[in-house]
Amino acid sequence: MRFLMKTATLAGLALVVLAGCKKPAGSGSSETKPAFTQIDWNTAGTISGTIHCAGKMPEPEQIDMAQDPVCSLSPANYSEQYVGKNGGLQNVFIYVKDGLGNKVYPVPSSPVVVDQKGCRYTPHVVGAMVGQKISFTNSDPTMHNVHMIPTVGGNQTADISQAPNGQPESRIFSKPELMMPVRCNNHPWMQAFVNVVENPFFAVSASDGHFEIKGLPPGTYTVVADHEVLGQQTATITVGAKQIATQDFTFAAK
């Protein structure tokens, strides 16, 4: 009888130990993922505006592409630093810098695509979210090179050769960075700028300077407009539910 009681006691202790070692329901070794904020289109507002260029915009400079016979056939052989029409300024990156609090938005699954066509990067300025894939394609029948030169720690330099009409090459950046330069080592006139931010609320101004940032929850925001040569401007703007708030920026031509 004493032996049976001792055996039962040991068995009970074993069950207690096993129960104590059991993982809580839902626990795992990986870190808890943040709860993403979804855009509420029933209340979302919009920031709309125009980027103006005060004064006479410098004339685009013609580029000598004679070093590559393929490139010399391109009609788009003018510089892209100052581009626009009717006083509007193109290729300005506009984004919401502050005002979203602790909201975290999902990274788009589709990549941002930059093509090398006519020996130019198209588009000249792009935006992406931190962690979003940026894909470079080569539609030209000539060799190109994608040389990305970040200045923020944690973002890795990329130096990629792409064969004529070759396969896309992609990179992902883990830190926010504005106006990250992209160059082609084979064609020194080729340049583009990549902007990486932490939310999906950004835009690039069109040829007439117009831009729109949609899907914003009602609130007050700090908005930044950044140009590759003319620098940054900042504004504070309040967006109401289902409202379009207007915010223009004016850069002085250099």
Residue ranges and their predicted role:
Residues F3, A19-G20:
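Short, low-complexity interaction segments enriched in Ser/Thr/Pro/Gly
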Residues C21-K254:
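Extracytoplasmic copper-binding redox domains, predominantly the cupredoxin/blue-copper superfamily
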Residues T9-V17:
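Bacterial N-terminal signal peptides
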